[in-house]
């Protein structure tokens, strides 16, 4: 297709596909929210698994971490989606969701292949931008991206796999405030078209792998659950060790663009704080693909650690330079005094016996 024709088609498709409300209920058709009578504290009344075992998210801290040398880097197949393939972006009433191509999958979760289903985000609000679901040593990040996959070797589709053993695998990306991220703008730039629940738009494909952090071979791995109802404990979690950065402006756009409610709802509710609280993690281990160190123990970002290290090296260099200068100066003064010979005054014998 010629570029001009493709551009025109994309522009046309960027118009909202559905202005009218549509249902975005979870798997079993019931409604739930993050606060209020149908909020997180009451999820287990309608969704028993939410009060059961292996719940997510969790806090990733040193006491529960164990290095596993067998954890290999994941391979991302089909993640580079052609711009000519259009992806459906939807406000599902709980988050902004991007439905993914069926030819996207991950290898490395032996012995099965997991096919991509969708990705979505969790975030806080403009006054408290700490909306990640997983935490590291008690630290919340600004937001969190989840890329959801199902076991395509064992099950025909996501719905069938969702409550089954080894059914799901989710990649979690922790997001912090920093430099602007053009890859995330490929989603954020379309948020105005999915402002209200049920609205959706087609957007051009892009390389989904660009949403992942540097060094994706470093990650936490544990068995947990969906973080939203029905909270099925069927998820193999991979939480990447290193966060990605988005700008303050990008985060603010995410925090202020969307609503939980339909366009015609008389009491609209901003889509904020759509994250579940950290769950108990009794008698489980989190396996890690990297040797435990400063980044894990403190939850500091790689950028902060490098900055501190650089400042330390610079400080040591200055101290050494000053010490060398003082030493040379002292040595120079000693050299200047070498040519001066002091002799005591000795009287002549004649003068002594006069």
UniProtKB/Swiss-Prot annotation:
Topological domain spans for side Extracellular: 25-301
This protein's record includes keyword Plastid: no
Subcellular location(s) of the protein: Membrane; Cell membrane
Transmembrane region(s): 302-322
Top-level class of the enzyme under EC nomenclature: lyase
GO molecular function: carbonate dehydratase activity; zinc ion binding
Gene Ontology cellular component annotations, sorted alphabetically: plasma membrane
Membrane-related topology note: Single-pass type I membrane protein
Active site, per annotation: 94
List of residues binding Zn(2+): 120, 122, 146
Keywords tagged on the record: Cell membrane, Disulfide bond, Glycoprotein, Lyase, Membrane, Metal-binding, Signal, Transmembrane, Transmembrane helix, Zinc
Similarity-based family: Belongs to the alpha-carbonic anhydrase family.
Function of the protein: Reversible hydration of carbon dioxide.
Subunit and partners: Homodimer.
Protein name stated in the entry: Carbonic anhydrase 12
Organism: Mus musculus (Mouse)
Organismal lineage: Eukaryota, Metazoa, Chordata, Craniata, Vertebrata
């Amino acid at each position: 297709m010629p570029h001009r024709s493709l551009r025109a088609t994309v522009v046309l498709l960027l118009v909202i596909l559905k202005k009218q409300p549509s249902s975005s209920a979870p798997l079993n058709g019931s409604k739930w929210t993050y606060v209020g009578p149908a909020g997180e504290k009451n999820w287990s009344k309608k969704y028993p698994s939410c009060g059961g075992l292996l719940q997510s998210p969790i806090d990733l801290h040193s006491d529960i971490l164990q290095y596993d040398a067998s954890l290999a880097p994941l391979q991302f197949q089909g993640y580079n989606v052609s711009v000519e393939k259009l992806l459906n972006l939807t406000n599902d009433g709980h988050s902004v969701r991007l439905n993914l191509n069926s030819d996207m999958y991950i290898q490395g979760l032996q012995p099965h292949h997991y096919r991509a289903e969708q990705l979505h985000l969790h975030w806080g609000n403009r006054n408290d931008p700490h909306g990640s679901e997983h935490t590291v040593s008690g630290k919340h990040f600004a937001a969190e991206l989840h890329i959801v996959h199902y076991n395509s070797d064992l099950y025909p589709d996501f719905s069938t796999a969702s409550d089954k053993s080894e059914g799901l695998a989710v990649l979690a990306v922790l997001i912090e405030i920093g430099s602007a991220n053009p890859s995330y703008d490929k989603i954020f730039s379309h948020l105005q078209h999915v402002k209200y629940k049920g609205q959706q738009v087609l957007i051009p494909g892009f390389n989904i792998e660009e949403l992942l952090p540097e060094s994706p071979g470093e990650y936490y791995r544990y068995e947990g659950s969906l973080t939203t109802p029905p909270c099925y404990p069927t998820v193999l979690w991979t939480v990447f060790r290193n966060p990605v950065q988005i700008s303050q402006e990008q985060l603010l756009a995410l925090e202020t663009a969307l609503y939980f409610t339909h366009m015609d709802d008389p009491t609209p509710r901003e889509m904020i704080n759509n994250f579940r609280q950290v769950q108990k993690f009794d008698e489980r281990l989190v396996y890690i693909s990297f040797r435990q160190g400063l980044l894990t123990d403190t939850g500091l970002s790689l950028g902060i650690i490098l900055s501190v290290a650089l400042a330390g090296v610079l400080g040591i260099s200055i101290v050494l330079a000053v010490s060398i200068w003082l030493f040379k100066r002292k040595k120079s003064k000693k050299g200047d005094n070498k040519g001066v010979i002091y002799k005591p005054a000795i009287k002549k014998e004649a003068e002594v016996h006069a």
